[in-house]
UniProtKB/Swiss-Prot annotation:
It catalyses: carbamoyl phosphate + L-aspartate = N-carbamoyl-L-aspartate + phosphate + H(+). It comes from the Bacteria. Belongs to the aspartate/ornithine carbamoyltransferase superfamily. ATCase family. Catalyzes the condensation of carbamoyl phosphate and aspartate to form carbamoyl aspartate and inorganic phosphate, the committed step in the de novo pyrimidine nucleotide biosynthesis pathway. The keyword Transferase applies. Pfam families: OTCace, OTCace_N. This is Aspartate carbamoyltransferase catalytic subunit.
C-alpha cells in the first residue's frame, strides 16, 4: 500500500488507498500481526472529550506493540499558554514517533504540517472539518455488509452543519461511487452539501436507502454558536429514525451512527441494538482501521517494514 507520514484528511485518499486500508484492517481483524523494528512511542493528544476514538486509537497502538505515553491537556503546559506547535515539537524532541491529535479548531494541523516534523501526525478530528479514521471505519462497515460502494444509496441525517463525520463521509462515499442523500433540519443543509447530494425528508429516505447514517445533535456546538435551545422530542418526531420509520426500511438496509448516540433523539432507543443496527460493529471496526492507519505511518518511517502492510 502507499504509505504516508501523516494522515489528516480523506482528501489524501484515492479509491485504491481506501481499499488498501480496508484490506489491511480486515487482515488485522483476522489475526495479522506486525513487528516493530525498534521501541516505538505514541501520544494521543485529545483537546476534546472522546470515548470511542481515543480508546480505540490506544487499543490499536497497543495491539501493534507501541508504548503509549499518557497526555492530559488539563495538566500539561497548554494550560500555561504553550502552543500546539510547541507541544508537538516538545514531544518529538523527547522521542515520540506518533502524535494522534483531536482539536476543536478546524484545520489545526495545517501549521503543524507547514512546520515539518520527523514524527507522524494522525488527525483524530478537527472541529467541524475532517475525521478520516471515522470515515474509513464507516467505509469498512459498509464494505463488509455490501461488498461494494458503487450505486449504494446512503443517507446522512442530522446535525450536518457541525459534523466532521458528514463532511468526511460525503466526500469519500461520492468518490467511491455511492449516491449520497441528506436529511435533518433543512437549515443545516448548506451549500457545501448540495454538491454531494440532494435533501429529502425522513419519510422519503427510509423507503429507499441502503444505509441510514444518523448523526448526533451536537448540543455543545449549538450552544457555542447562538445559545439555541433544543427540543429533543420534536426533533425525534420530525427527523429521527422512529420505530415506525425503521419498519419501512428495505429489508437489507442497515443503521449506522458514529456515536455517542442520543437515544430517543436521532433514533429510537431500541434501534441501537436492533438486528439492522451496525453501530457496535462500527466501534469494533474502529480498532482495526486505526491499526491500519498507524501501521501505514510507521511503515513510512521505516519502523515497520513495507512488506508487513501489504495484503
Amino acid at each position: 500500500m502507499k504509505t504516508s507520514q501523516n494522515l489528516v484528511s480523506v482528501e489524501q485518499f484515492s479509491n485504491q488507498d481506501v481499499m488498501a486500508y480496508l484490506k489491511l484492517a480486515q487482515a488485522f481483524k483476522n489475526g495479522k500481526t506486525v513487528q516493530l523494528s525498534q521501541p516505538t512511542f505514541a501520544m494521543n493528544l485529545f483537546f476534546e472529550n472522546s470515548t470511542r476514538t481515543h480508546t480505540s486509537f490506544e487499543m490499536a497502538e497497543r495491539r501493534l506493540g507501541l508504548q503509549v505515553i499518557p497526555f492530559d491537556p488539563k495538566t500539561s503546559s497548554v494550560t500555561k499558554g504553550e502552543s500546539l506547535l510547541d507541544t508537538l515539537k516538545t514531544i518529538e524532541a523527547i522521542g515520540v514517533n506518533l502524535a494522534v491529535v483531536r482539536h476543536p479548531r478546524d484545520r489545526y494541523y495545517q501549521p503543524l504540517l507547514d512546520a515539518g516534523f520527523d514524527m507522524s501526525l494522525i488527525n483524530a478530528g478537527d472541529g467541524s472539518g475532517q475525521h478520516p479514521s471515522q470515515s474509513l471505519l464507516d467505509m469498512l462497515t459498509i464494505y463488509e455488509e455490501f461488498g461494494h460502494f458503487d450505486g449504494l444509496k446512503i443517507a446522512i441525517v442530522g446535525d450536518l452543519a457541525h459534523s466532521r463525520v458528514a463532511r468526511s463521509n460525503m466526500a469519500l462515499l461520492t468518490q467511491l461511487g455511492a449516491q449520497v442523500y441528506f436529511g435533518g433540519p433543512k437549515e443545516w443543509y448548506g451549500r457545501d452539501f448540495e454538491a454531494y447530494g440532494e435533501y429529502q425528508t425522513m419519510d422519503q429516505l427510509v423507503a429507499t436507502m441502503d444505509v441510514m447514517m444518523l448523526l448526533r445533535v451536537q448540543h455543545e456546538r449549538l450552544s457555542q454558536v447562538n445559545n439555541q435551545t433544543f427540543d429533543a422530542s420534536a426533533y425525534h418526531q420530525q427527523y429521527g429514525l422512529t420505530a415506525e420509520r425503521a419498519a419501512r426500511m428495505p429489508k437489507h438496509a442497515i443503521i449506522m451512527h458514529p456515536a455517542p448516540v442520543n437515544r430517543g433523539v436521532e433514533l429510537a432507543s431500541d434501534l441501537v441494538e436492533a438486528p439492522q443496527s451496525r453501530i457496535f460493529q462500527q466501534m469494533t471496526n474502529g480498532v482495526y482501521i486505526r491499526m491500519a492507519m498507524v501501521a501505514s505511518v510507521l511503515a513510512h518511517q521505516g519502523l515497520i517494514s513495507a512488506t508487513q502492510v501489504e495484503v
